């Protein structure tokens, strides 16, 4: 692994509490990344809300912050530490979402922080349902019919056009949390409300079900 001479200090976002879909594998990979980057001579600043991790061992990073994983707190750390780069993808969905928010609010540009390990537009294409559809269309890949909704009423109208059952897919959630397969308006109203709340951007894709297709 070659060293980039334009980067001296790297901010790494941890994954926070261990939950289903975002467990100890992120702690392990984050720890290994810290060790590898330190070996190359980079200064490592780590922020994680979970103190009960290997990653937050005092010897893992040069500076460790046990702080809530939110945009305001991350901006404070960036302002104080002035990292050259942000490595978000070792923090699971939490890290990716925070990276997107920091970019959207202009915080990364404000402090001259470049994102490494993953491109911000790649996060958007993978997490934002509209951008994902655009990418698939540009590649000529067929998908099930779908439309994006930002309210329960919009989702109900889309489902009426597509026909039940439909699949609800919230944007920017871990493992599709908050979504599901629904068979009627009552189920859709309940699941969609949950999905909109879970989504970082309040967005749910309403997609025709291909259940039983071969």
Descriptions of predicted regions:
Residues 1-214:
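N-terminal beta-alpha lobe that positions the nucleotide/phosphoryl donor
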């Amino acid at each position: 692994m070659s060293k980039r001479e334009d980067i001296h200090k790297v901010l790494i976002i941890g994954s926070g509490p261990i939950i289903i879909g975002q467990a100890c594998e992120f702690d392990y990979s984050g720890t290994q990344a810290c060790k590898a980057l330190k070996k190359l001579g980079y200064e490592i600043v780590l922020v994680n809300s979970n103190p009960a991790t290997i990653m937050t061992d005092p010897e893992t990073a040069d500076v460790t912050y046990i702080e809530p994983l939110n945009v305001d707190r991350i901006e404070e750390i960036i302002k104080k530490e002035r990292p050259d780069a942000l490595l978000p993808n070792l923090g699971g969905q939490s890290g990716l979402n925070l990276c997107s928010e920091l970019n959207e609010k202009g915080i990364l540009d404000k402090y001259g922080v470049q994102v490494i390990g993953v491109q911000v537009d790649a996060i958007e294409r993978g997490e934002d349902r509209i951008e994902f559809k655009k990418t698939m269309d540009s590649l000529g890949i067929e998908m099930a019919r779908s439309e994006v909704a930002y309210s329960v009423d919009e989702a109900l109208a889309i489902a009426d056009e597509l026909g039940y059952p439909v699949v609800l897919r919230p944007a920017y959630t871990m493992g599709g949390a908050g979504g599901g397969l629904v068979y009627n308006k009552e189920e859709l109203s309940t699941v969609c409300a949950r999905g909109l709340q879970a989504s970082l951007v309040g967005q749910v894709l309403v997609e025709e079900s291909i259940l039983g297709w071969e």
